[in-house]
Design a protein with these regions (language model features):
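Structural signature of nuclease core domains in nucleic-acid processing machines
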Residues: 1-311
Length: 311
């Protein structure tokens, strides 16, 4: 804040008094710019300076009992942050045209993340990865492998700017989601959030539309029946993934506004796809997947609540 202009007259006239007794005290106030993520919003916490964890690396409750040692690798693959990070890293690298390298990637990450997988388990992981690579995605109806043949980005990091002058309007966010059938219960913390950060696992283009794909290693159970579309939808509600998906699509919405001269959300936003990897099985092709598309007016409304015009 700038101080008021000084009076003229060299300090000797009647109009000039002792500044120590009459001048107002001018103070400059600095409001910190804080950053948050989807996971931090759910914890009602602000991440100060430490690097953001990818959303998949945030620990979630794993209540299902352990599978028998001889069960399918989908159910015996280790749970937790490190195994999830390792699987995401492999999925970022593999493509149909580098099939001969998959085993090398698995062995490398098995050592790096200290997963302790035996050679027979790595064999099973290769078969599992093949099922994932060739499964049909729920919105675009192409395979994951095919989605990597055209324009795409893996691990696409983004930062959403919000209005620096006011606190993030948590009640408005809750009301916006409730009005569209996805009630949230975020706590109204009066935080001055300047940035929301995140990372999209896989962003790709198909037939002129842009799709968001997110991988989940959540363990929902030890049988195919635990990964039906109905159970996937329930799990997404339990973990507030509707919010995560919406933030991802707002980020894509803002990106395309700057890249496409003829951008039209109804024409270019292709939808959001979630793969619950432990449920991907050719014997049960409908399992482990969930996809939908928010209406353009929902994304535009959330964008306004986040303060895009003032950001």
């Amino acid at each position: 804040t700038n101080p008021p202009p000084q009076k003229s007259g060299g300090g000797q006239g009647r109009g000039c008094e002792n500044p120590r007794s009459t001048a107002p005290v001018w103070r400059t106030r600095f409001q910190g710019w804080q950053r948050s993520s989807f996971s931090a919003l759910l914890r009602d916490a602000i991440e100060p300076t430490s690097p953001d964890l990818a959303d998949y690396a945030v620990a979630t409750p794993q209540n299902a009992p352990d599978a028998p040692p001889d069960a399918d690798i989908r159910y015996t693959y280790p749970r937790g942050t490190a195994p999830g990070s390792a699987l995401h890293t492999v999925l970022e690298r593999i493509r149909p045209d580098n099939r001969r390298d998959w085993r090398r990637y698995l062995e490398h990450d098995n050592r790096q993340w200290q997963l302790g997988l035996e050679p027979t388990q790595l064999d099973a992981c290769e078969n599992w990865l093949e099922a994932i690579q060739y499964c049909e995605l729920p919105q675009s109806r192409i395979s994951l492998g095919a989605s990597k043949q055209g324009a795409h980005r893996s691990e696409y990091g983004f930062t959403l700017g919000s209005d620096a002058r006011v606190a993030l309007d948590i009640p408005a966010i809750n009301a916006h989601f409730a009005a569209h059938g996805h009630p949230l219960h975020l706590s109204d913390k009066h935080r001055h959030i300047r940035y929301l950060r995140g990372e999209i696992d896989h962003l790709y283009q198909h037939d002129g539309r842009y799709y968001i794909l997110d991988y989940k290693t959540n363990h929902l159970g030890n049988s195919p029946a635990d990964y039906t579309p109905e159970n996937i939808r329930a799990a997404m509600g339990d973990h507030h993934y509707w919010l995560q998906a919406a933030l991802y699509q707002v980020a894509l919405h803002r990106l395309l506004q700057t890249r496409l001269a003829d951008y039209d959300p109804a024409r270019h936003l292709g939808g959001i796809e979630y793969l619950y990897l432990r449920g991907i099985d050719p014997a049960h092709p409908a399992n482990g997947k969930y996809g939908w598309n928010y209406p353009p007016e929902f994304i535009a409304g959330l964008d306004r609540i986040l303060g895009h015009e003032a950001a």
